[in-house]
C-alpha cells in the first residue's frame, strides 16, 4: 500500500517538475534569441558615403571628396592584414598600388583589389576628375567571424581549431597626401617626458 502511494506521488511530481522547469527557464521568447553570426556585421562604414554636407559659402575652398570602401569576411588574419594596411597609410593611390604589386603576401593582393574598386567608385559616384589625385587617409583592419572546428588527432582524440576572418576598411580623400610628420628626436621625447612629470596632480585634493 505504501509503495503504491509513493509511486503515485512520484508520478505526479515528475510532470510538475517538468512544467516548472519549462516556465522558469524560458527567460526570452524563442523569436528574440539570435543564433546567427550576422550581428557583428555593421554597415556604418559604407553609410558614410551617403553623408550630405551643407552648401559651401562663396569663396570657400572646395571640399575634397571622401570615398569609404571595405571588404568583409576575408579568409585572412586581421593581424597580418593590419601590417599591410598600416604600410600604405598616408600614401598616394598610385604609390600604394605599386607597393602592393610587388608584395608577395596574400593580403596585399586583396587590398589592391579593394583600392582599385574604391578608385573606380570615386570616379563613377563621387565626381573625382583624376583617378590618380587620391590618397589613403585611413586604412585599417578588423576582426571578422571566428568559426571553431574539430581537428582530429590520433587515438580517438581531437582538438579545436579556429577559422578566422577579417574585414578591411579604407578611406580615400581627393588631393595630394599630406606631408609626413617630422620624427621626434631624443631631446623632444625628453621634453615631453619632463612636461608630463610637471603636469602631474594629486587626486582628491584641493
Swiss-Prot record:
<dbReference type="GO" id="GO:0032543">
    <property type="term" value="P:mitochondrial translation"/>
</dbReference>
<keyword id="KW-0809">Transit peptide</keyword>
<dbReference type="InterPro" id="IPR001063">
    <property type="entry name" value="Ribosomal_uL22"/>
</dbReference>
<dbReference type="GO" id="GO:0005739">
    <property type="term" value="C:mitochondrion"/>
</dbReference>
<dbReference type="Pfam" id="PF00237">
    <property type="entry name" value="Ribosomal_L22"/>
</dbReference>
<dbReference type="InterPro" id="IPR036394">
    <property type="entry name" value="Ribosomal_uL22_sf"/>
</dbReference>
<dbReference type="GO" id="GO:0005762">
    <property type="term" value="C:mitochondrial large ribosomal subunit"/>
</dbReference>
<protein>
    <recommendedName>
        <fullName>Large ribosomal subunit protein uL22m</fullName>
    </recommendedName>
</protein>
<comment type="similarity">
    <text>Belongs to the universal ribosomal protein uL22 family.</text>
</comment>
<keyword id="KW-0496">Mitochondrion</keyword>
<dbReference type="GO" id="GO:0005743">
    <property type="term" value="C:mitochondrial inner membrane"/>
</dbReference>
<comment type="subunit">
    <text>Component of the mitochondrial ribosome large subunit (39S) which comprises a 16S rRNA and about 50 distinct proteins.</text>
</comment>
<dbReference type="GO" id="GO:0003735">
    <property type="term" value="F:structural constituent of ribosome"/>
</dbReference>
<keyword id="KW-0687">Ribonucleoprotein</keyword>
<keyword id="KW-0689">Ribosomal protein</keyword>
<feature type="transit peptide" description="Mitochondrion">
    <location>
        <begin position="1"/>
        <end position="40"/>
    </location>
</feature>
<dbReference type="InterPro" id="IPR047867">
    <property type="entry name" value="Ribosomal_uL22_bac/org-type"/>
</dbReference>
